[in-house]
């Protein structure tokens, strides 16, 4: 076991104090509305977001931010940070990204991560600070993509455990089944060109926007 792996495990740990557990990314509304009531619908929903949102936006931009931080190309860091913000389709999703990004930034500053307090034209997204942490800890870029995808997936299944609710065993079965998709999603993200990046999931945007007005919620909005 090497130090880079240990740093990656620390970065993707659910215990990392950034507050990701407080958000469901629209999943709470999708469940509450009955959209995912049929067998297999929950896994289908999470798979769709993993492949077409995380895989087409967060992961390929993470790769570009990693390389920009590594090259000290702050104009590129700024550009891709703004690109991610522009692709958050609801106020809720943008607020989540800002809150997680600022939380990781504060943590990184406290851990004396070089460049963590670099001023950008807009508040840092989570993926922006995640990329910087990966660079400073010498985590390989592909490993960092795997770690990000795993962390996102684990958080979604944890949210589903509370919302559906799933039993602990069923949650682990879902997690193990879906983790098999991560290699293909990451490999696809590595191949994408700049003009192919972005997200367009109407159901996710609808769920998130309606969650903002949901009467009773477990998760933040």
Curated annotation (Swiss-Prot):
GO terms for cellular component: cytoplasm. The keyword Chaperone applies. One of its GO terms (molecular function) is nickel cation binding. Pfam families: UreF. Gene3D superfamilies: Urease accessory protein UreF (1.10.4190.10). Keywords: Chaperone, Cytoplasm, Nickel insertion. Its main location: cytoplasm. This is Urease accessory protein UreF. Belongs to the UreF family. InterPro entries: UreF, UreF_sf. The keyword Lipoprotein does not apply. Signal peptide: none annotated. The gene is ureF. It is found in: Cytoplasm. Required for maturation of urease via the functional incorporation of the urease nickel metallocenter. UreD, UreF and UreG form a complex that acts as a GTP-hydrolysis-dependent molecular chaperone, activating the urease apoprotein by helping to assemble the nickel containing metallocenter of UreC. The UreE protein probably delivers the nickel.
